[in-house]
């Protein structure tokens, strides 16, 4: 019988009958295809087709072990040809209030993903970021089906594409639906990178013209927006920034790469790369020594 987290050689542990392997950044993932993808994602991004294969295998396993729940999994995953189709279905299911609406919004998302395959690739990176950074979600299927922060972000990607195509009213409609259904409001004019993680996905507000870099993590109740004095200028958030719960970032400011914003912090001035901002108003701490990379 395996002892919980009994170390073998420092590279893996045993827990719950599974062999969990240690990733390059010290996180453990189960020895499954999804777990191996998580480890691979530390070295580079897994292609969409390979990710989709892993998701389908997880869905097939669920269908075999739990036929009652498996029927829902079939509709969400196995009935679709590719990752974009499954994403479109999830967006429609989450935003629609009746069958006709769900079909309509799913069709809109599908058309956008077909017109811009890059958005599907971006979604795959977002999903991999969840698995790589949240040990509580070692598989791909649960966040895809149940994590509203992930779906809200993909709905925003659709609305942002529509906004850039000058389909303003439809873009704003999707924002409103996402806010109502998912408690995440991201303006279609914002700019957001990839490998972005909306943990908990509740109470997140990103205002117009905000710029969010790659690998940013949002906790719940984060607000990023403009000030009344400069309505055309919004915050710019760098790569790898961690935004703790209740953080508020306002105005024409920059938050540098890999900075951390503390819980409940109100930031109205620039935060240099690698620094931590805490308090109300924010003060800086734990900044890198001069000449040392953040």
Placement of each model-derived feature along the sequence:
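Terminal amphipathic alpha-helical/low-complexity segments used for targeting or macromolecular assembly
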Residues: 2, 13-21, 26-177, 294
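Structural signal for interior beta-strand "rungs" in well-ordered beta-sheet cores
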Residues: 179-289
């Amino acid at each position: 019988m395996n002892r919980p987290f009994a170390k073998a050689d420092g590279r893996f542990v045993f827990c719950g009958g599974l062999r969990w392997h240690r990733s390059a950044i010290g996180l453990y993932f189960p020895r499954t295809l999804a777990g191996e993808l998580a480890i691979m994602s530390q070295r580079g991004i897994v292609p969409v087709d390979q990710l989709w294969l892993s998701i389908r295998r997880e869905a097939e396993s669920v269908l075999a072990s739990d036929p009652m729940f498996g029927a829902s999994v079939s509709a969400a995953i196995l009935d679709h040809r590719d990752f974009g189709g499954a994403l479109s279905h999830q967006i429609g299911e989450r935003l629609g209030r009746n069958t006709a609406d769900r079909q309509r919004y799913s069709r809109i998302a599908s058309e956008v993903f077909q017109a811009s395959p890059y958005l599907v690739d971006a979604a795959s990176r977002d999903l991999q970021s969840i698995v790589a950074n949240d040990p509580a979600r070692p598989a791909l299927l649960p966040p895809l089906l149940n994590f509203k922060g992930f779906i809200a972000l993909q709905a925003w990607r659709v609305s942002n594409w529509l906004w850039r195509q000058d389909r303003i009213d439809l873009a704003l409609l999707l924002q409103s639906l996402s806010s109502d259904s998912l408690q995440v409001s991201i303006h279609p004019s914002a700019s957001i990178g990839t490998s972005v993680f909306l943990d908990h996905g509740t109470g997140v507000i990103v205002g117009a013209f905000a710029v969010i870099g790659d690998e940013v993590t949002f906790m719940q109740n984060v607000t990023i927006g403009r000030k009344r004095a400069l309505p055309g200028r919004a915050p710019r958030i760098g790569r790898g920034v961690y935004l703790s719960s209740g953080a508020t970032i306002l105005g024409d400011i920059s938050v540098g790469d890999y900075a951390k914003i503390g819980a409940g912090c109100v930031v109205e001035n620039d935060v240099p790369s690698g620094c931590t901002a805490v308090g109300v108003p924010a003060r800086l701490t734990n900044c890198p020594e001069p000449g040392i990379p953040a």
